Each structure stands twice: as C-alpha cells, then as structure tokens.
Regions:
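Helix-rich catalytic cores of soluble enzyme domains
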Residues: 2-83
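Active-site capping/gating regions of soluble enzymes
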Residues: 63-169
Length: 169
C-alpha cells in the first residue's frame, strides 16, 4: 500500500459480491465477505488512504425488490459491524453499494420512485451517520437508468448523507 500511496493513490476499492438465490447468500458468506471488506478498509486507512467499501448485491435473478432490500440490509449491517470491530474510521470511508432493485428477471418491475424510496430507507436504517458519502454503483443498470434512480434518491434525501455515482467505463 505504501508504494501505491507514493505513486499518488489516495483511494482504494475492494468489492464483495452477493448473489440472491433461494438459500443465498448464506449467513457465513455475508460474515466472511464483511470481514474481508473490513480488514481491507483497515489496511487502506493505515496507509493513509480512503477505503471505498463495495458490498454489491447483484441484480441477476428473479428476486423481488423486497428481497433485495432484505439481503442488502443484512449485508450492510454486517459490513458496518465488522468495520467497527476492525477500528475503521467510518468518517474516512466511502460506501459503494447497490441500489435496491428487483432482479433483472423479475416479472414485477419497480419504478424510479419505489427504487429511490427503498434505497434511501435501507441506508437510513443500516448506515451509521458517520459515513460521509455513498457512491452508487450501476449494478447492471444502464447508465441512464442508474442516473435517473440516483436523481430520484437525491430529490427525496432528507439525511446528511452525500450521494453520488461511481459507474461508467
């Protein structure tokens, strides 16, 4: 990490991926990935850089928006628990989560307002206030869809959280 810092790096990202299936992600998977993200974040902060913590619940599959909300909530709660255990300074961390979306094969689609409300509600219930910012990933959405959803989230944002995007190639 010191070498990267000397080269000018000030942020570093680590990603953990969670698939929603009938019995997945398992509690063991959630805990193991949260621990790995937290260890990485601690190492990054020790190197005087900002960790970008990316717990991504994939939109692949036919799960409902409510199932995504449920799984994402569990994932975020466990991630923040592990970040605290590992003495990661939350005020020096950026969260890069998925938005709350139905699976790409789900027959019941969600509109932008529903996605925004569920995403904001999930973060309000799981994310400590010390976290200064959220940089959403597109997570399989087109850049246009993701941007519309981010705009809707920002319009109803009644928190001190700062929301932005981190997508595009």
């Amino acid at each position: 990490m010191d070498e990267y810092y000397k080269l000018g790096a000030r942020f570093a990202k680590w990603r953990a991926v969670y698939s929603i299936l009938s019995n997945q992600p398992s509690e063991q998977c959630i805990k193991a990935n949260a621990h790995a993200l937290a260890r990485y974040a601690a190492i990054v902060q020790e190197a005087k850089m900002v960790p970008i913590v990316e717990p991504e619940v994939l939109m692949d599959g036919d799960h409902t928006i409510d199932k995504c909300y449920e799984v994402t909530s569990k994932v975020l709660i466990e991630c923040f628990k592990e970040l605290k255990i590992n003495n990661v300074k939350l005020e020096g961390t950026v969260l890069k989560p998925n938005m709350i979306l139905p699976g790409s094969s789900c027959k019941k689609k969600a509109n932008t307002d529903e996605i925004a409300k569920k995403t904001l509600d999930c973060l309000k219930k799981t994310m400590p206030k010390e976290v200064p910012g959220v940089a959403f990933l597109s997570g399989g959405q087109s850049e246009v869809e993701a941007t519309k959803n981010l705009n809707a989230i920002n319009k109803i944002n009644d928190t001190n959280f700062n929301f932005t995007f981190s997508y595009g190639r």
